[in-house]
Amino acid sequence: MVTGIEATYMDFTRRTARYPKRREKEYLMLGLMNEAGEVGGAFKKEIRDHVDNTDLIIDEMGDVLWYLTRLCDVYDIKISELMINNIDKLLSRMTPEEAKAYREEG
C-alpha cells in the first residue's frame, strides 16, 4: 500500500490526467520523453546564455515526475519500490568492495 506524500501525489496525478485512456501507456511514455527533453533544453539554455535556469529546470523536472508517477500507477509500481530496485541495480554494477563502502557510508 502506498502512503504519505507518494499516495497523495499519485492520487493528484490520477485526478489531473487528461488524455485518451485507450492509449494511456503510449501517451504517458511519449509525454515523459518530451518532458525529459525539456529538462535538457532548459539546461542547454543555461549553458548557452550563462544564466541560472534552476527554476525552469525544477518546473520541467516536476513535469517529468508527473509522467513518471502516472506510469508507475499504470504499471502498478510503487515509487519507493522503483527507488529500491534502482539502488539494487546500481549496487550490482559495483565491485563488491565499492558496494560495501557505499553501504558503510549510508
For each predicted feature, which ranges?
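Flexible "arm" and connector segments at domain edges
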Residues: 1-106
